[in-house]
Each structure stands twice: as C-alpha cells, then as structure tokens.
Amino acid sequence: MCISCCFFIEYCFTMKRLRPACMRAAIVALLVLATATGNAQSVRSTYFMEGAQYRLQLNPALAPERGYINLPVIGHAEASVRSNTMGLNDVVDIIKNADDADYFTTDKFYGKLKDMNHASATAATDVIAAGFWHGKGFMSLNMTVKADGNLSVPREMFSFMRDMKGMNHNDYSNYLRDINGGDLNVNVYTELGFGYTRVINDHVSLGGRVKGLLGHGNVSLKMEKAQIKTNLEGLDPDLDWTTADPIMLAKATGSASVDVKATLESSAHGLNYKLSRDGYIDDVEFKAGKMGVCGLGAAMDLGIEYSPNDMFSLSAAVTDLGFIRWSKGNTVRAYSNTSDLNYDSNNPGDLMRFTDVVATGKALNLDMMRLYIDEQEAKARTTNITSTMALGAECRLMENRMHIGTLFTNRFSKPENQSELTFSFNYHPRSLLDFTFSYSPILCSGQSIGLAMKLGPLFIGTDYLYMSKNTKCCNALVGISVPLGGRSFD
C-alpha cells in the first residue's frame, strides 16, 4: 500500500491538523518518497553516468566529470513510493476515499491485501549543493532536507473491521481475533554534508562523506499484538456492531475483552497529543509552523572504485551510517494499558461501551490502543537512520562512451530490507550529454524499466517508469545545475 508523493509531503510538512481521516489513509496506505537510501539515495540509474553528480549519493567514490552548483530546491528533487500490495491506481482510490471508513472494508480493497502489507516512502531536496575538482580530489557540500517513512499493516486488522461491520459470519459465543505485528515509522531531518573523493592512481578511487544531522521529527508506533475476545450468547452472527444499540445488546449475556500491547515514541516540535477524559491519547494535532530542530546526529558515507584496466571496474559503498539523538524536552513515550477493557453483560452499559471501543470504523483505533503517556520516560532517545549498501560492476566500451553495468543495492530498512538488482546501459557521447536505459527486476516484479538523461544543466531520471495502473513502485529525480570546470588530469 502506498500514498502519493504529494500527499506524503502534505502529511509531513503542511498539514495543519492530523485528522482521523488522514490517519486512516496513512495506516492503510503510506509512505515512501525518494529512492531507497533510506533518506534519499539517488536514482540507481545514475550510478554509471559519469556526467551525473547525483551518483555521489550512491557511492562517494564516483565523482562526476565536472563540478556543479545545484540550483536551490530544483537542483535536486526526488521522490518515490513503493508497496508490496497495491498499484498507483489503488493509491488514488485510497486518497479519494480517505474520509470513508467503509471503503477499507470493501471486497475490492480487502481482496488485494496480503498477510502483511508493507509500504515505504522517502523524499529529498537540496537547499544548496555544490562540488568542484581540485587536482586529483573532488570536494562537495550539501544541505538537504530528507523525509522517509515505513508502514506495515497486517490483513487481520481489516478482517477485524469487516467483522465489526457484520461482513463475516462469526460465532460470538467463542470469538477470537488476533492481530499480530504492525508498525509505523516516520523520520524528517536536514543533512549538512561534506564529501571528498580522491583519485589515488589509475586503478583506485576512494570517497567519503561526513554529515551533520538536524532532526526535525521522528515517530515510531509499534503494535505487538491486539486480541479481541468475546464469550457472548444471544447475538446475531451477522451483527453490524457499528449500528448496534442498547436494546439489541440487552439480549446478550456473557463477557468480552480487548488486550492490546503497543508502544509510541515520538520527538517533534509542533506535534501535540490530545488526551481523553480517561487520560489516554485519542487525537493528534500537528502544527507545521512550529517545526524546528529537536535532535542532533551524525552520519557518514564510504566508497571505493577499483579499475584493473581501462575497460572494467568494480565498486562498493555503504551510505548513511549514522544516528540522531533526540532531546528529552521534545520526546514522548506512551504505552498501551487495556486493563480496563474487560466487559460483562451483568454490568449495565458494559457491552455498549465495548461497542464504542471496537466499532469505530478506524484502522488506527486510538480508543482500542489505550496509549498512556509515561512522564517518567520522557528522556532523550537515539534512532538510527537507514543505511544502504551498493555493489557495482561496469564494462566500458567505445573509448569510454558506452557503459554496461550491474548494480546491487540493499537498503537496511524497517520492517524489511529492500534489495534491488539494476542492469544498466549508458551512452555518454559528450561531457554534458548522458543517456541511460536500465532494468530493475526485483522491487517492481520486473514490470518496469528505467530511463535517465542529462542534457547540459538539466537531469531527469527514474528507475521505474510508470507503465500501468498496477505499478507498485515509482520514483523520479529532477535537477537543474550550473556546470563548472572538469578534472584536469587523464
């Protein structure tokens, strides 16, 4: 499941209020905007393009032929979405029906779900970025805003919603619904980076980048389990709990219970939790205007390229090895406590209260999760950013004007790693002209191709060209830069 790039940007940066409908859409769909380095790895099709500076993000040892100055924002803007469940056309339907809780219980939606549904999204844009050659060294600097998110939702969550709508024939005298697993992670920060690439000799180039990180926000919600159990006699197996009334429930005898184990950790300016009369979180408010720096961290990229001769080269890199330390004053920890969610028909009104908790029609049911903020746990916390490994092999032909390459990348993301294999064909007739055709068969199930081109100052590229409404992943990078002088050695 996935949400469109524009929706995610709105969700992270401009949303004035995180309404329940938006939360439902996020829980059903979510997130990943940019390419897969867990926070803006560049499009993989750039890896073997010697004229593209964006490949430095994949491997700091791969310096471009010329220096550059990226124009603010439009010098480097990239985004991507990926899901293991739904295509881009389904995303449009999800956003269109975000206010309609019934949509997420329809056969059309439910039939496309897997046992565990993953989605991820990341986005990045440069505030400023530049690089230039000095002798055999290439220096670069950047200030980049990055955002990424990952979501996992079990199908059982939607099965339970359908149960509460009376869509499944259930024996409520011995009903048990176990919902295991599920988490949401969102991270937003600014990267201040300085990179250096050194051509050691004709065979070896080394590169590295050190980064200071300014954390703007981090949210981690994990649900280990949710168990709903009833031992109720006298109920219709097809009961729609969302329309149940006290008269209908008065016929029932027995007990019911809800047991949830969940944890919420967050650090962000402008993120406020509203509490119910019983003291648990029942609403979330986000004020984008109050967003600021509430965490500091550091990271590094390391890379190497080895060319045994003029025709072949091997390369490897690890990027985004780092962490962010979030301040105590902006950190909230909350834990579920459902000890009071036990109901007995002998207690007047108990079953109606049970109905109010379980039949909200929301995928993210805060009333059922019963998250209580622990003031004693309001202390600093540390989170890792998502690192990526890259391994490449390249063959150069036609006096270095044609390149054929293979690239393997693995993003060490949560809740699952994302691996991709990219086969690339590149034609580089002039220093300011570069064209690439690529094919990445794993993440998109072999249903898409990649294209990239650099025409003077303009760059456009994608690893997954939109080809059908069922495409489950898509990314794009657009950039405009001012070219500077090239390297002065052979």
Give the ranges of each region predicted by the language model:
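Outer-membrane beta-barrel porins/channels
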Residues: 46, 157-490
